[in-house]
Amino acid sequence: MSEATGKKAVLHLDGKEIELPIYSGTLGPDVIDVKDVLASGHFTFDPGFMATASCESKITFIDGDKGILLHRGYPIDQLATQADYLETCYLLLNGELPTAEQKVEFDAKVRAHTMVHDQVSRFFNGFRRDAHPMAIMVGVVGALSAFYHNNLDIEDINHREITAIRLIAKIPTLAAWSYKYTVGQPFIYPRNDLNYAENFLHMMFATPADRDYKVNPVLARAMDRIFTLHADHEQNASTSTVRLAGSTGANPYACISAGISALWGPAHGGANEAVLKMLDEIGSVENVAEFMEKVKRKEVKLMGFGHRVYKNFDPRAKVMKQTCDEVLEALGINDPQLALAMELERIALNDPYFVERKLYPNVDFYSGIILKAIGIPTEMFTVIFALARTVGWISHWLEMHSGPYKIGRPRQLYTGEVQRDIKR
């Protein structure tokens, strides 16, 4: 729990003083508890909740000014390079990294639930073949509550925990199938002899005709890091959506489906896809210099550089760049678009205009390049983001349900018509 500092903020309102308690977390700025303002007949006004803490949480801490991202106290770069994704999942869910024995047990639990009910596979046939994979994901993830309804008592901790495992285990299967369905290929089932990232890539790219298909270990490691680097990011739009939906008592599958819907918005989950679209618009390496001049003149936007939260650098980007270099070296790809991206990076890291404004490449810039190099189409980028973020969403959902909570009910500043009568 947060602790009262003993300090109070004083609000002068209509000739009266309202004392508002100030609380401290373990890290980050103090917060002012404004709920007593309601008794005065007033609301606070904070569009976008930019200065509002909607909850207490022990899961993730971000200091955007210093470029810090911690999961349960551990720096993200350490988790991405010294732990794997499922260890990070265990950490987010339980608060501590697993012991060797706990890791074996947790990995086995996840493997045991990677299959989905056979009727779920038929559910895909209701979608058009040209449907966006995110549209499919919203539908099939929400529909899981119709197939696993025997464990939906959100007051039962055992039901909550098994649902968390099921979501982490089944989302990669559904994500890969959403791709297979849109390209008209048979579904590939998960294999218990593969790790989490290998399994996903196998379900994405293996076919019944290619029995010798093997996942490149460099690509599996890269995918695992992408999953880890996107596992959670505090109270962002989609996580807040999951919490808000969860506050109504909605089942967890519905809540995660709501999170996927929020993530689908281009302002949230579409950043790495936007990077590839920008590269398409630039066209060739020869056009990069002129494009960057247009950026300076504010004629076009530079996607994948800078970050809304991180004012200095994105702590995930260094690991992602290293991973990007490893993937491109391993594949030896001669892709004009990747060469174009590298030229963008070179200019941004050396041009004083971008350096002074701290417009460094962020995680979305490098992840987009990696996913393209692996062979994943751009419409699947946000699906992979949703796959990785599922553990963050369900961790916040579990945290909220572990104690007392209130249904979310934001207020508004009404600017419409005053009361009037119908006149006929």
Swiss-Prot record:
Keywords: Allosteric enzyme, Transferase, Tricarboxylic acid cycle. InterPro entries: Citrate_synth-like_lrg_a-sub, Citrate_synth-like_sm_a-sub, Citrate_synthase, Citrate_synthase_AS, Citrate_synthase_bac-typ, Citrate_synthase_sf, Citrate_synthase_typ-I. Its EC number is 2.3.3.16. GO terms for molecular function: citrate (Si)-synthase activity. Pathway: Carbohydrate metabolism; tricarboxylic acid cycle; isocitrate from oxaloacetate: step 1/2. One of its GO terms (biological process) is tricarboxylic acid cycle. GO terms for cellular component: cytoplasm. It is an enzyme of class 2 (transferase). The active site is at H307, D364. It catalyses: oxaloacetate + acetyl-CoA + H2O = citrate + CoA + H(+). Belongs to the citrate synthase family. Citrate synthase is found in nearly all cells capable of oxidative metabolism. Homohexamer. This is Citrate synthase. It comes from Acinetobacter calcoaceticus subsp. anitratus. The gene is gltA.
